[in-house]
C-alpha cells in the first residue's frame, strides 16, 4: 500500500479480522482492509468468493439473513457498526447501496429521490425538497434528461437512466459511503460508460466500494482493488500496482484470465 496508510483521517472504513458464516458455512475468513475516503475501491474475484457478502457487511444488510453470524470489526469514525445499540437505519443513511439491477420505487421520478430525505427529516419546506431533488439528480447526471417529467414513473426510464435514478436516490441523503454491487452488469456499453464516468465524479464527495466481474472496469474506475478467493482477501493494493505487478500468483492468474 502506498497511500499514507498510517494517517487515520484518510480512512473511511476500517475492517479487522472479519469472519462471517451462513449457518455452518464460513463465507468470509479473517478479512482486514482499510478503505480510504474519496476513492473508488473495487472488489474482484470469481463468483461465490465473498465479494458481495463483504460489501453487505459494511451496512449490515447481512443482518436480514437469519442464519448469518459475524465476528470481527467494521469501523466507521471510530464506531463499530456491529456494536449492540447501533442504529441500523442511521447506518444505512450513512452507507448507501446501489444494486445489480436497477430497482426504482414504484413512484414518480421526483418521489424516488425525495422519499428518503423526507423520512429522515432532512427537509421540511417544499422549496428545500425541490432543491435537494434537483441536486441529487444533477449529481447523478440525470437532471437534464428528466427535469420536464419529474412526476412520471421512475420505471418509465431506460435501464441506464433507472440505475442513475437509483444512484440519485442513494446520494440524496448525503451518505459517507456508496456501495455498488455490480452496478453495470445489466446495462448496455453506453450506459456502462456513463455510470463509470459518474463514479469518477462522485468520489469527490463520497467513498465508493464496488463489486465487479469486469477486469477492464476495475482498471478504469478503481483507485484500489481487492482480490477475493474462497472467502479470503488474497491481495489488496493500488489498482495500477495490482494490474501491472500483482504480488500473488492467484491474483495474477485471475486478472490475466488464466484462473481455473
Curated annotation (Swiss-Prot):
Major location (coarse): membrane
EC top class, as a word: translocase
Subcellular compartments: Cell inner membrane
S-adenosyl-L-methionine found in the keyword field: no
GO cellular component: plasma membrane
PANTHER family for the chain: ABC TRANSPORTER I FAMILY MEMBER 17 (PTHR43423:SF1)
Annotated protein name in UniProt: Phosphate import ATP-binding protein PstB 1
Species assigned in the record: Chromohalobacter salexigens (strain ATCC BAA-138 / DSM 3043 / CIP 106854 / NCIMB 13768 / 1H11)
Gene: pstB1
Amino acid at each position: 500500500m502506498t497511500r499514507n496508510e498510517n494517517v487515520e483521517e484518510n480512512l473511511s472504513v476500517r475492517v479487522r479480522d472479519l469472519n462471517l458464516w451462513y449457518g455452518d458455512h464460513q463465507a468470509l475468513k479473517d478479512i482486514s482492509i482499510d478503505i480510504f475516503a474519496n476513492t473508488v475501491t473495487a472488489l474482484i474475484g470469481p463468483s461465490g468468493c465473498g465479494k458481495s457478502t463483504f460489501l453487505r457487511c459494511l451496512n449490515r444488510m447481512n443482518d436480514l439473513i437469519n442464519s448469518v453470524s459475524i465476528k470481527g470489526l467494521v469501523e466507521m469514525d471510530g464506531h463499530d457498526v456491529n456494536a449492540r445499540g447501533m442504529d441500523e437505519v442511521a447506518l444505512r443513511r450513512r452507507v448507501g447501496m446501489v444494486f445489480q439491477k436497477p430497482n426504482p420505487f414504484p413512484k414518480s421520478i421526483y418521489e424516488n429521490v425525495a422519499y428518503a430525505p423526507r423520512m429522515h427529516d432532512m427537509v421540511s419546506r417544499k422549496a428545500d425538497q425541490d432543491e435537494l431533488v434537483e441536486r441529487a439528480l444533477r449529481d447523478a447526471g440525470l437532471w437534464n434528461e428528466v427535469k420536464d417529467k419529474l412526476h412520471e414513473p421512475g420505471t418509465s426510464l431506460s435501464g441506464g437512466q433507472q440505475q442513475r435514478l437509483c444512484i440519485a436516490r442513494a446520494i440524496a441523503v448525503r451518505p459517507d459511503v456508496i456501495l455498488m454491487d455490480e452496478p453495470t452488469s445489466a446495462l448496455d456499453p453506453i450506459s456502462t460508460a456513463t455510470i463509470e464516468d459518474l463514479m469518477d465524479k462522485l468520489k469527490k464527495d463520497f467513498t465508493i466500494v464496488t463489486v465487479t466481474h469486469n477486469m477492464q472496469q476495475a482498471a478504469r474506475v478503481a483507485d484500489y482493488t481487492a482480490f477475493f478467493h474462497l472467502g479470503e482477501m488474497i491481495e489488496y493494493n493500488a489498482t495500477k500496482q495490482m494490474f501491472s505487478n500483482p504480488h500473488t500468483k492467484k491474483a495474477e492468474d485471475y486478472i490475466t484470465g488464466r484462473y481455473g
